[in-house]
């Protein structure tokens, strides 16, 4: 059996640019990509916490240290500057691998200040 698992996640980053006329994609600060283990040109899902939109695109590297999150092309209709989003990538693996798998998660606050990284998502308390 093959399972689709969360590979990496940027939790609650803020959109800094939305460029309808750029070639598409989402430019992400290289430091953020590294923290979540997301590669340039990798498929990503973006979930807009601010307006509820959910869409897919691919990651491109933004300038390291710039804190850029630029939603480009047609996807710019789905996010505005200042929106809070979650960016995730996924990986396919065997059931055996999945049971040992730990995603890379980076948590953000304010103006894209990375507060911490983790290799697990905390259990949600009832």
From Swiss-Prot:
Its main location: cytoplasm. It catalyses: L-aspartate + H(+) = beta-alanine + CO2. It is an enzyme of class 4 (lyase). Keywords: Autocatalytic cleavage, Cytoplasm, Decarboxylase, Lyase, Pantothenate biosynthesis, Pyruvate, Schiff base, Zymogen. The modification Pyruvic acid (Ser) is found at residue 25. It is found in: Cytoplasm. Is synthesized initially as an inactive proenzyme, which is activated by self-cleavage at a specific serine bond to produce a beta-subunit with a hydroxyl group at its C-terminus and an alpha-subunit with a pyruvoyl group at its N-terminus. The keyword Coiled coil does not apply. InterPro entries: Asp_de-COase-like_dom_sf, Asp_decarbox. Gene3D superfamilies: 2.40.40.20. Binds 1 pyruvoyl group covalently per subunit. Its EC number is 4.1.1.11. The active site is at 25 (schiff-base intermediate with substrate), 58 (proton donor). GO terms for molecular function: aspartate 1-decarboxylase activity. Belongs to the PanD family. This is Aspartate 1-decarboxylase. It comes from Enterobacter sp. (strain 638). The lineage of its organism: Bacteria, Pseudomonadati, Pseudomonadota, Gammaproteobacteria, Enterobacterales. The gene is panD.
